[in-house]
């Protein structure tokens, strides 16, 4: 289908199938604004009409020849399905798990709550991850035709679950924010995602992603990388663990971090070092009070 170069670039960045984007009736081709309008429709929960012929439905096995309800892979759900399948097919993805001691974060957050609002536990993790990206530039990267492009600024995407799918708004210049500023922006983006008021700039330019399933009692999981990023961090639930420290038995508040990375971009040792930097920052959250230098 005819499409402008800007439209193709934006569609590729957001993982949008141009065959699903209506042609601009005046331009008689797909424009960047056509893609932007299509994305807004997906965010609002509307499934735009498909311009490609639908394939014939597959016959159900005999054992399932009874009334069923089919959820069509169209609109946002269809975009997610294609994007995640392409991600797993095109990257060498693997995941490591590391526990983080959260006692210092719990104490810091409690002190903040006494004087007003406090960041969420996920906000602390995002802030720590953004600073760790500055220490480990290989993780803040993209695979290009020429090699691994190291990106100068960390823009961290935060996965937000909606009724019909998952959307990843982006906190711009994440490491350049102090914890309070980051918390305000993450709250704004999460609310905008849920009420369908996100704008296109809120979804562009992410260099790394954080996904949280801790609210469902999950410890570790294997998040799928959001292209064109080369890594994504999963955040598990807060839990009380019995641990042995210097010969003394005690209870510590901990959570599990799950880092999935593209082995084409970097190996296991750099991945582990990056995750360890996050753990160290969570162990002393005072470093998150000011923007990273």
Q: Predicted segment positions?
A:
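Short acidic, glycine/serine/threonine-rich helix-capping segments at coil-helix boundaries
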Residues: 1, 18-30
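C-terminal catalytic/motor cores of large multi-domain enzyme assemblies
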Residues: 6, 10-17, 29, 34, ...
